[in-house]
């Protein structure tokens, strides 16, 4: 008889962590929703999210793993030498897109079945969707942002574009559903759009309400397989000059393919080889006269696009929080399965303290993301007070910058909590850390968002209303402290009369 462990099929094998229904396993999310939603809305939303939490864990997760294993590739030429610049993705990536449409990840925010609370429902569903999506959540963020921007276009070419695109951006039918890009970053920079070089030349007679052709390089375009995009460019004057600075930028709508199905005068220079988000197609593009339509007033591109960016920053916040929630959920399950020094890892006090600290961080961030969603929903429906608007203006950059940094630090703890297994690629844990890193870069880095928060305070005078509300909430919370302390004291007294099972788990025996 061979000794245990003598062969690759003998000896100890560690059970892998298991993912249960992602909604039922997120107590803080459920509590936040129950607190924010009216009773009838809570009943509907709870049923929808309970069902979807199972789908995210069972159907979506294997699709996401497949999409990650087979990243997109660029095919420059067909068999006969014709330039095609086709980005090939896996069927799994396409199926995840279909699920996004079927589940109404974008549509919920525009169907408004629960009025101002629809954004809360939508963002809670995104919270469950994102960690199982192979970053399909990225094109959804830009799609939602474009939908919100176009929804506000009520005149001129922008209104005509909205009539064509908005029903597609908000559809639940996968055969109709469009996603949108957001082509801002150029070689000159991302957040500093004032140095953008793309030029728009007025041309008459273009199809699909086109008003201009675009010429320039877009250095970092995520979700390049989308059907349309919003982008910035400088309108060329009749004398060939272009206006400088951010005030010289105008906003344009462009469809990525012409009526013949070919790219609309777009050349894909290369796909980006990134640290993470490997399943997400990200490309460097050359616009060679791409037909586009001016949206909004000339030279007002940056103010116009603010409606879009507020949405994408909220998506970033939700994705950061939900990614860490997924990591902690797996770490907790692993801790119940992994035994060290004769006890489950979950009974080792130091490890338990580490997980508890992450849970505390997640609790606050989950409440924050849902609160921001509630404010956005009120603004969408015209029910936001002046204080609501001020709070949303300030919290949007602050929530994004804080949760993104929190996500990177927290995911590093998650990797460490798995020990060596957390450093091995085929467990999927290292990928979670790499993917978390982009969330502090997308939609503005920490410093850029800090400056935006400063503008909200100085220019928009948002701090006063926010502090006033914070003091009011703190006062209400303080009134509840005595009762909470009494309950804690009672629990402590009961606990002191019994010896907890973790008492003998540390330090480990040296025998």
Regions found by a protein language model. Name each.
Residues 155-203, 207-210, 370-389, 396, ...:
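Internal maturation/activation junctions in enzymes
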Residues 114, 259-265, 269, 274, ...:
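A glycine-rich, basic-preceded beta-loop-alpha segment at the flavin cofactor/substrate interface
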Residues 1-115:
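Extended, charge-enriched "interface" segments that sit outside catalytic cores
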Residues 83-167, 171-176, 222-223, 442:
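Internal helix-loop-helix
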Residues 211-263:
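A short core secondary-structure module
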Residues 277-306, 420-446:
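Flexible glycine/proline-rich, aromatic-decorated loop/lid segments
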Residues 4-8, 24, 43-47, 51-58, ...:
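Alpha-helix capping/hinge segments and adjacent helical runs
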Residues 313-381, 464-489, 498, 502-511:
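Extended amphipathic alpha-helical segments enriched in small hydrophobics
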